[in-house]
Amino acid sequence: MNKKLIIIGFGLIAVLLLWSGVSIYPDWLWFENLGFSPVFWTMLLSKFGFGFLVWLLLILIICLNLYAAKRLNPGDGPGVAFKAADGYVSQLGVSGRALNSLLIAFILILSFVVASKGSFQWDILLRYLYQQPSGSTDPIFNRDIGFYLFSLPFYILVRDGLLVLFIFAGLVTMGWYLKNGALQIEGEFSQAEGVPTSLPKITITPKAKKHLIFLGGIIVLLLAWGYHLKMYGLLYSTQGPAFGAGYTDVHIKVLAYKVLIIASTAFALVLFVNAFRLRMKLIWLSGGIWIGAVLVFAILLPILIQKFVVKPNELAKESPYIAYNIDYTRKAYNLNRTKKVDFEVSDKLSAEDIKKHDVTIQNIRIWDERPLLQTYRQIQTIRLYYDFNNVDVDRYLINNQYRQVMLATRELVVNQLPPRANTWVNRHLIYTHGYGLAASPVNEVTSEGLPRLFIKDVPPSFEPDLKIERPEIYYGEKTDQYVLVKTKTEEFDYPRGDKNVYTIYQGSGGVPIKSFLRRLLFAVEFLDPQILFTTYLSPESKIMYNRRIARRAGLIAPFLDYDGDPYVVVSRGKIYWIQDAYTTSDMYPYSRRSYGHFRNKGLNYIRNSVKVTIDAYNGDVAFYIIDEKDPIVKTYSSIFPDLFKPFNEMPADLKKHIRYPRDLFEIQVDTYTKYHMEDVQVFYNQEDLWQIPDELYGDSRQEMEPYYIIMKLPEEEKEEFLLMLPFTPSRKDNMIGWLAARSDLPNYGSLLVYKLPKEKLVYGPMQIEARVDQQTDISRELSLWGQRGSRVIRGNLLAIPIGDTFIYVEPVYLEAKQEESELSSTGSPQRGAVPVSSQQDESRGAAIPELKRVIVAFGNRLVMEENLDKALSSVLDVQIFPKQLAFPSIPQIQDISNLGVLALEHYNKAKDYLRQGNWAEYGRELENLEKILKEISSSGKSGTSVKY
């Protein structure tokens, strides 16, 4: 039985290893193709090495204990027996061979489970071995922060692992003793009722007792180590008024743990000594003292001190520790370098202010990402099998002007092919890639209410500054399945009229399929026998897999966390993706934890230390370190020297497009609402708590999202690309401040908070929304549209600082109403994405969101006009000329009829520039038109012909 079981066990292990090898080989080929083979082997050997070490330790501990048990008690007898009135009638003994088989099976299963779990902790081991100091220390134990980030997690892992191993070893040993009679359980039972009638009596031989006492000593010694580690764990306490160790923790619990360490160590020594001399009274006495120490020092004393000493004097006692919490939380979330600026709000905005901030005004965003995505899907999807996943926001220099641009990639979704065309060949060999993108400025709209497109159609037409020479997208956000390229059949490239254009992949992406063995392995890996049997493959064929952006970066560096919105960049004629990567930890001392981010894990330290770039055509991936001071990324750089590159090696054109990531900003904003209060008493009383304001989207009230904006900061000389969000006081709607994160080099990463005067009312977003609803004319017009078969969508309300004041801009879109079933199927809107498939869009016909009105508020004035220019001019009482340039003189003409022709020409040009959002030229044409009309007016009065 034993031999058969051993053979079966090792056979299962061999099958698992073989299956793992089948999966490992394609992974290695993929890493090697990207140039990250050393990274692959470091991770693989670390996983297997650490897992094997855990397995070996478990086997060693259990086998040594079983060997000792067999030597100490070689006999065989019943371990469980019950006695009736007429003697023993039931014995629950287990035969030696059966128990041996059960033990072997138990050990094999347990060792595999524990070793597998241990292998997943490989990065904790490597971070411990390669840890880099942070240069700062905690305020209680004066240990380097690196100890908490790297050493403490490893010590906790080792201690917990050993404790579990020795507890399992004790249980296995007890099972062995139960089997051979060294441990016996006897009791009485009722024959009539068949149930025990008394508590069972447990007896154990002296040798078995000594063995189990020795194991108990090891377990108690591990508990002593646990008390030592718990001292450091006090820095993550949540018991006080702030996160981290408080007065009771520092003055009582630290002392209590030191006492318990001594008591536990002494008790363990008593157990070790009595494992040889066996004085049970001494063991019971020592155990009682140890338990008493735990009850008094770990439980009772802290409760009494907290209730009778700390609570009545909480602010005085806890003040130093609240200050630690404020200081270390701000450091952990990189808020300690936030620059505070007083923002004295004015009620006036002059023509000179408009002129000074013309670039800001030209880049006011009137296109919301959500309706714009629907519009793109309607006017630029081109074919059923194309789709846009989300809309990204970036900035480009176009015609030598700094422009904020919205972009969305046109990706191919093979599941949207018609049923007859949804064949294996089409899915994996022909329809292999998306094509091009749609891009539009944030502020321009056509006369039909649609975006003016900088990049459009297939093949793409584009602005010269947004040239695209490689529009193919093999790697994107929706590329979930593998494809085969350089096969004997051509790939679909893009549609043209009634025919299609085909191509053959010319890039370096993909893993070569050189041999029958590789075909077999890939067929097994993807559970697809067609790879093995297809005749379309050639010696040059390649297979592309792991093509989705988030997965691609995550497989190479799974120890990093990734932003939820990788964004597209057009650079040097190609399409790239930039993915923000973070180093995080939940072990930063005294720092408040934040939840709900990155796989829903808690964290209390975060840095955007790495920028990842991915070539959409070749799939090349590069990791650039942008924060060289971060100890976590420095540690990973030591572990993986071939993975990371310095930021100065990033191509210069891509550097222009790095931006402050939204996920990080949202975490920082959430933290800053409370931790902007640096005064301990104010923090304790929560006197100045802020909150993120709400806004309306459509008819729903939701929390306002951070938004990108091009603007000139106060005291700065030029405009820059920022991510910003306003704040309101807790449970209030007026604005109290706003936070801005800078994206342009060399100021990338700088945070500025502008604090508004508390004694003056500055409208918050919901107050503006309420004023819109209360404005009779606007409310009536919106209601009428809603009653005439249109859905009114109120987009993002943006609070835009101009000089030392704010203007508020909210776009209004109209969309043909959907049927109720369609509306319910779309779900709730999410940032940057509208959960409407292309098939749904096709069925919706004319349901295209069109920008029809723009609401602008300034001070106590609020208007709704057909376009932003009219709205700004109306609310500010200033004609919007972003650039006051010298206008050229109008050429001489002979009579008034020619003046009329010229007036019409300038009028038409002005309309064209208005649609384009070219405020400078628009203003110039209006100025010329005004001059001509004045001449016509004066000449009409005099009745004479004019020469001008």
Go through the PLM ranges and name each one.
Residues 834-836, 946:
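Short hydrophobic transmembrane-like helices used for membrane targeting/insertion
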Residues 827, 832, 940-943:
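Residue-identity detector for glycine
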